[in-house]
Every structure is written in C-alpha cells, then in structure tokens.
Amino acid sequence: MGGSSASRNQSSLLEDTHTSRSLISRLFSRSKTRHITDFHIRPVDPHRKYAKGDHVTGAVVLTVLRPIRITHLTVALHGFVKVFKSPNAAHEATINTAQIASGVTNRTRYLGNGLASLFQDEQVLSADGKLEAGRYEFNFDLVFPSKVNLPTSIDFERGTISYMISATLTRPTSITPTTVCDRKIYLVEKVDIGSIPAPRPRTISLEPISRRTRRRRTDRPSTLGGADRGSSLGDSHDVTSSDLDSSRAPESVAAESNIANDAAFEGQQAPQSPTRTEMPDVMSEVSTESAITSSSAGASVGYKVSEATGSSSGSQFGARTPTVEEKTITASVEMLKGGCLPGDFVPVKISVHHIKRIKSVHGVIVTLYRQGRIDSAPPISSFQGLSKEDVRRLEKEEYFPRSKTGLSGLSLSSAGSCSVFRKDLSQAFGPLIIDPITLDASVTISVRVPEDVFPTIKGVPGELISFKYQMEVIVDLGGKLASQISSVQSKAGGISAGGAMPSARNPYESGGSSIMGSWGNSIIDTDQLRRHKGVISVVFEVPVGSVDSSRQRTRGGSLRPNPQARQPSQATESSQIPTVGYGPEDKQRAQSEPAGQEDYVHSHGSQGNGPMGPSTEYVPSPYYTPHDPRQQHAPIYIPPPDVPNDMGLSEKERARRAEQRLLPSQPPAAPFASTLSETTLEDIYNVEDDAAAGPSSAPIVGNSNGVATAPTLDEVESGEAAVGNSEDKLERERHRLLQEASAPPDFPEDYDTGDPGPSNQGPVTSATAPALSFQPSAPILSEDDEDPGSSYFNQHTSTGDYMGAGALGRPITAPHEPLPRYQR
C-alpha cells in the first residue's frame, strides 16, 4: 500500500511539472496551429492628405505558414462619423467596421447610436481558393467619391470623423471565420474662401431714455395691499431691469434679434427684457428710488440698444427729449475679410460716434474662438433613404426618446443629446480714444489665425458634428472696462495664470495701421465682461478654408499688359504727354488724383480712346523716374553673344576664357580717351550714362584673345559692330546727345539748379539741359576763412536763394561754385 501511494504521488508530481512546462512553453513559443503570421495594409503614400475624388493605392500583405483555404479576400475604403455620449465613451468600445454597410455605395446611412456611414468603395482581391505557404501582396486601387460632401478627418474626445482602409479575410470555418485589419488615412475638405464676400457691417445704436418724466399708472389704488405692493415693486423691477439689460449688447448671434425686439416690448403694459433670465431676481426687495439710483449709477439718462434710431410713441418712460439724435451713441463693427486661411490675419474695423470724450486703454477686445457642436441622437427625419424597418429599429434603440411635440417630455437640461463647447484661439486688444473735437474714433485690430487649425466642418449628415470659427468683438462704450480687466488680472495672479493680459506685441504684425495687443496663450475670459453696463458685443462667423483661389489668380493668373497694345498713336502723343512733377506741389496734386490714372507702364496715351477697367497693377510713387512715352517703341532685340565652340580646348583654357568674359571691355586708345575727357569734363555727374565716358561702356576696339563679348545697345541701334577711331569729334558728340535724349533724367526734378526766381517756376524737365545746372552744392573752403559757415550763410541769404523753390529746406549754392576735383 505504501509503495502504491508513493508511486501515485510521484506520477501526480510529474503531471504537474509537465503541465507547468506546457503553459510556459505556450507563452514564450509560437503556436503551432497558427497559419497566418502577418496581415496588414501598406498604402503607397501613408502620410498623404487626400481630397474627394483622389485614388488610394496600396497593397494588402499576407504571410501564410501553412496552406489554408479562404472564401474571399476583400478591401474597402469607407468613411464614418461617430459621436460618443460621454467623454469616457471613446475608450470603452471600439467601432465595429463589420456593422458598416458592405459593397459600393455613395449613400449616407444612419446606423444608430451616433454612428453614420458616409460612403464605401469595396474591391475583391481574391476569390475562393487555397493559399500555399508564402508571402502574398494584393494590390488595390480605391477611389474617394467626388460628388459627395466629405468632411475633414478629425479625432477628439467626443467624436470622430474617420476614413479607413479595411481588409477582410474570410475562411470556411465556424470559429472566427473573418479576420479584419484596418489602416486609417486622412482627408482634408477643400474649402475655397476666394469667393466668400466680407460680411455686412453691424451697427448698434444706444438711444437716451429720460427717467425724470416717468408716468405712474393711474388705475392703481391709493393704498397698496400685499398684492398691490408686490405689483408696484414688480413694475419698478421691470423698468430698472429692462434698462440694465438693454444697456448691454447680446452675447451671441442668436441674441441679435432680441435687440430689435427691445424697442417693441417697450410700449407694452408689462415690458419684458429679452435677457431677463440671465439676471438674478433681487430687485423686488428694494424700493423704486434705490433701484433707479443703483441702475443709473449716479446718471439721470440711461441708454437702450436698438438696431436703428427712432422714436417710440406711447412709451411708459416718458417723452423723448428733442435732442435724441445728438445723444445717440453709434458703434459700427466691420470685418474686412470674408474668410481666411490658417496663419492669416483677420482685420476688424470699429467705428464709434460718442456723445462725450472717453479714453479706454482696453476699449476693444477681439477674440477668435472655435465653436463645436455635437448631437449624439439626431432626428431620424434628417436622414433620407431609410427603410421602414430601419426607422422602427432606430426608434427602439434611441437613447433619448422624443415626443411628437419635440419637447422630449420631462428631462433635465444636462440630459439632452446636443453639446456645444467653445475653444478660444487668439485674442487682440486695442484702445478706444474718442476725439474730443469730432467725438469719433476708428480702430482697426488684426487677429492672427493659428497655423494648426483645421478648416471649417459643416454639412455632416444629421449635423452630428460641426465646427465653425467665430469672431467676437467687445466694445467698451462706457470707458469702465479697464478697471474690470485689472481686477481680472489681480484675481488671476499674474500672466502665468492665463487670465492676465500681456502687453507684448504680435511678432508677426507689420505696419502701424493695425493693433495687436495680446499674443500667446494668455487669453482672458470675456464672459463676465459682456455683462457689464455700457459694453456691447458683436459676433461674426469666420470661415476658415484650405485654399484661396483669389490669391492664386493674383499670383499666377494675371498677365502683365502688353506695352505695344497700350502704345498711343503718333498723332495723339504730342497732346497727351504726361507731366510728372517732383516738387511738393506736384506731390500733393499727384496724391489727390485717382491712382488709376497712372499705372506701371504709364498708359496716359490711351485715356481718350475708351474706358479702362480698374487697374490692379503696381502704382509707382511720383518721385520715381518716369519713362518718356515718346521713346516707348518696340523692344529692341539684343542678340546673345557669339561664344566660340570650346569643346576641343582643355579645361584650363576654357576656365581662362570664361574669366576673360567676366572682365570689362578694353579701354580705347590714349588719343581717343584724351579727346573724350575734354568733352565730358564739365558733366561729371553723367559719366556713367555716357557711351564713351568709362572703360566699361566704351566701344570695343579689338580683342587680342579673340574672346567674344555681347554687343552693346549702341551697336545694335547704330547697326555698327564697333565705333572706330576714325570718327570725328562731331559724330561722337551726336551719339552722346542721342543717348542723353533717350535716357531718363538722372536727377529728380525737385533738385533745384540754384537759379533765383519765383517759387512757382516749374522744374527743368529737359534731359538735354547743360551740365552747369547740376553743379555741386558744396562750398569752396579756403584756409583763410575762419568761419566759412557764417560767410556762406550771409552770402546766400543776401541773394535770396537759401530756401529756393523745391529745395525742401536745404541750402542751395550758386552755379558758379565748381566741385573740387579729386587729385592723387
């Protein structure tokens, strides 16, 4: 018995040891029954951002260890929208791609529980058969639909818009017959902002309300009981609360319609403020006198917000004063751009007409924010193409039952299916300083759109997910917002808390017309600032796109006009020669004229031939040197230099010839240079423009090395290869005069020649003026002069040419003072 028990214990110990070893071996060793080791999708361009209508190519990689039988292998490209009911639901369950409809379809389907299918494109890679051991790659080519609105891919804590490539391998087995692998790709919706116009400007008027002639109701009894006393207090509450509520602007776009309703409700027996629910009901415990005092804050005139100024007869607050228009505050807010791209600046112009002088350092606050909206249980009626069975199934599976009236029965506000959230992206501040003379102020503030934002998302089926960008403009018409911002800074505890407003300027902002106060992550909360008295708020929607066709047309689509097409006829040239001045009077006259009268090519000659469209070309400053229209002929063709063939030469010889081609031309002979020096000695400022003044512009006499150089413009015009030394002095002088006549003036016309005369004398515009008129203005100093400045001043003040016409405040010397020549 003892031996049998010992053998039994030993056998059980051996079985336990074998079992433990088998478990360890299963953990660390590859399973022998596994037939497929690798199954994944490899797209050709995995990091590409696709658009609708693009082709998605790639391959499905499959590695088989043992021969297996398959039913079919398919690959599908599909897009879907999923909204989670809670922020934690994104990590609880994954989306079952098998639930999405199979096949090729471009129709949107709602599958319930916040899941909707956008489209699906399926392709069969392999049919029924047997796969031997090896590595297989099945290529595919899928297409995004081009006629379906596909929103941009996005993943966030409350939902997702995803596009995936799913490969499904089906085997003829009862246990796990399908094997699925997914690969996510990204799509960006093409939102063109080039054709979006700028929104209409919003105008808000604050009209005065006189409280001193307020009428009391006569149907009230003289003694106030409990109910009557409460009614009287309620009436005073209505008056004061309406004034308080109407003195501030609406907080959203939906509340803008309430501004116009404020004036309509004013004439009723029991006026109700459109924003009554936002204020606590604390006015019923105070008296009428204290209520008026607290609401007016020491002032006897209040204001109400309205879209247009007008009188409302029968108002219970009393008759209007005759100076209503004079005491009306008007604020106009205009967004200067209809749309923007990531990284752009969005300018906003604020114009205020006030009744008194105010100065607010932070009077204008512009905030760019993104507003997202999700709906986990959209109405089934928003989806088309659902069968009766699908409608019946979706009504049973709907988490939030809806009644026929649309009120959803008795439910809490937090139990709704819609959620709206806001994310502040950028903020800018600007001062509001009213001019004490005109009582007007105009401020332009630019807000920069961050570069990492995604385009506006709209048009999702059932409005499951939507993202839009809005611009909130807050204007302090009371001048008391600076103290509130400072209190917010003190409560926030500094700039690091994120609630303070730094004084740093936008590093990307250029130009002094726009103001950018805040930059970075320090964005203050404007929710409390909107509720202050005398503060108005206007909201614009800013579409953020991905492309701008208007910029592309401006860069590459516009063609410069042909100068020959604008060439005037010879008969009208003499009568339509433009006169471009350079003096102060001419500058003022040029600024007062419209910019369309002078474009880059000076098309003045075609003004009388017919109407011209608006010019989009660059308009130069009047101080630039203009081209003479009498010289606007056909462009002269300059042939390329005749470079000899140096294929047979050595590398050293080719380098030497290339170096010689970079050197200037050889100077002329000594006798020729001596005669030219006498001709050009007086005109020392036009040396660079003369044809034979310097070595670089002298004609080519000869080249001992035989290296070809490009012919000059003078050679092409005269038709000669070179100007020989045999030409006489008169011929060379004629060439020089022709070049001076065709060249633009070297000096602006505001350069006074020093001739004393009346101030209204026009500047010398002739290009062939003698060189004596351009003499230097430096005085000649001698060693005997102790105080050359005083003698110089006395000399020119006596002649009256110290401040000549067009001198621009600089001393002008007489033309008889030559410039000292340079001597080595």
Swiss-Prot record:
MF terms in GO: protein-macromolecule adaptor activity; ubiquitin protein ligase binding
Biased composition (Polar residues): 564-578, 758-768, 791-800
Biased composition, class Basic and acidic residues, residue ranges: 235-248, 649-660, 726-738
Short name of any one Pfam family annotated for the protein: Arrestin_C
Region (Disordered): 197-281, 547-824
GO cellular component terms listed in the entry, alphabetical order: cytosol; plasma membrane
InterPro entries documented for this protein: Arrestin-like_C, Arrestin-like_N, Arrestin_C-like, Arrestin_domain-protein, Ig_E-set
Domain of life the protein comes from: Eukaryota
Coiled coil feature spans: none
SMART domains: Arrestin_C
Stated role: Required for the proteolytic cleavage of the transcription factor RIM101 in response to alkaline ambient pH.
Name this protein carries in UniProt: pH-response regulator protein palF/RIM8
Native species: Pyricularia oryzae (strain 70-15 / ATCC MYA-4617 / FGSC 8958) (Rice blast fungus)
Gene designation per UniProt: RIM8
